[in-house]
């Protein structure tokens, strides 16, 4: 999906992110990622798009926002790879 030249990637449940703004997609189970999530929550930079489901990936943007997604890290990586090929 594109929006005036910006490619959008589906994060699940009808939520999208501009692909060029994403810096990293990481697994949420490590201690550093838990700290990152808590710091982002405390600083108002956390966006939760899990709709109450378990967090399976964390997306970090160039604006330092942290997005929680219920989609597996590997699946998110594949979606970004597919967007790069289009």
UniProtKB/Swiss-Prot annotation:
It comes from Nitratidesulfovibrio vulgaris (strain ATCC 29579 / DSM 644 / CCUG 34227 / NCIMB 8303 / VKM B-1760 / Hildenborough). It comes from the Bacteria. This is Putative regulatory protein DVU_0899. Belongs to the RemA family.
């Amino acid at each position: 999906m594109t929006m005036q030249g910006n490619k959008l990637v589906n994060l699940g449940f009808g939520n999208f992110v501009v692909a060029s703004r994403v810096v990293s997609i990481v697994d949420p189970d490590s201690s550093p990622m838990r700290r990152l999530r808590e710091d982002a929550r405390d600083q108002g930079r956390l966006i939760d798009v899990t709709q109450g489901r378990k967090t399976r990936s964390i997306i970090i943007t160039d604006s330092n926002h942290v997005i929680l997604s219920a989609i597996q890290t590997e699946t998110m990586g594949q979606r970004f790879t597919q967007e790069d090929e289009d």
